[in-house]
Amino acid sequence: MKILILKPSSLGDVIQALPVLRLLKQHYSAAEIFWWIDTALAPLLEGDPDLAGIVRFERRRWGKLQHWPEMLRSIRWLREQNFDLVIDLQCLARSGAFAWLARGKLLVGLDEAREGACGFYDLAVPRASFHTHAVDWYLAVLPPLGVPVHKDFIWLPERPQLAAEIKRKGVAAGARLILLQPGARWKNKRWPAKHFAALAGRLAQKHPDARFGILGDRGDHPLGEVIAQAAPERSLNLCGATSLPEMIEWIRRCDLLITNDTGPMHVAAALGRPLVALFGPTEPRRTGPYGQLQNVLHLDLPCSPCLKSECHYEKPEECLRGLSPATVLGKIDTFRLKPPSDQPI
């Protein structure tokens, strides 16, 4: 049996879709499963034990005429695979078209698909309610296929070879590690850097044995520098300094992640690591940290969640600016922060 899953982006969305892969492989142990993914996120799935291969997709290149021959070769390859099942979890016109062009025997998607993608599907799976979490909605494609849904699976398999990198950075076994994620794709999903810095300073005072790591991409490096100054001798600005697999292992190793609504938040939820998630314009019941919604902080404003990437409230971005460091610290105080002595280094 051959199966193709289409979920090219983003990081958080791909993480939330991984349970579909895990349960398909458990049910169809001999199946060859392929994943269609954005080239930038391919390292997330490279070497995954449940995949027979990944199909790289580079949206910006394929939108240009000179790259059409490459696109046609990919389509030809997809057709040659003779997939028995194609599952489109991206549900946009592009992914729906590629799913249809793969000519699988059965094409399944989600019934809230945008841009007319539903027209490509043999079966469109409804969302149970507006507030149904993305993970549960993705998993809803499985029962119609005869695949049971349960939680007995490893979401993100460990990569022990990367643990040495953490040790090289100076975080020894048994040390308490607190990670902070100040960036986000939407500007209005970012808790202010000055708030992160103030929080880090308070945490450094309360936990003198703690080390701090600031996660993010290269563009977040200035934010990381601001935050690191709160405890300069105990902070590592990791923004732009880790690969995607390395970032995952840093989160696996941490005692606590303090994060905006972004990809690393979903990584921590998948790994079962303690987190505090700061939400503003988005709806945590739909896309919050799965299994840890009780650890979400957000303000109950008339406009929130607006689900918009730009703020139009009379007090700009008040949904996050109004969350004080003291409020976040109070939430953190409810955790019993213990060094993860059972975490391999």
Regions of interest found by a model, annotated:
Residues 1-345:
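Catalytic machinery of carbohydrate-active enzymes
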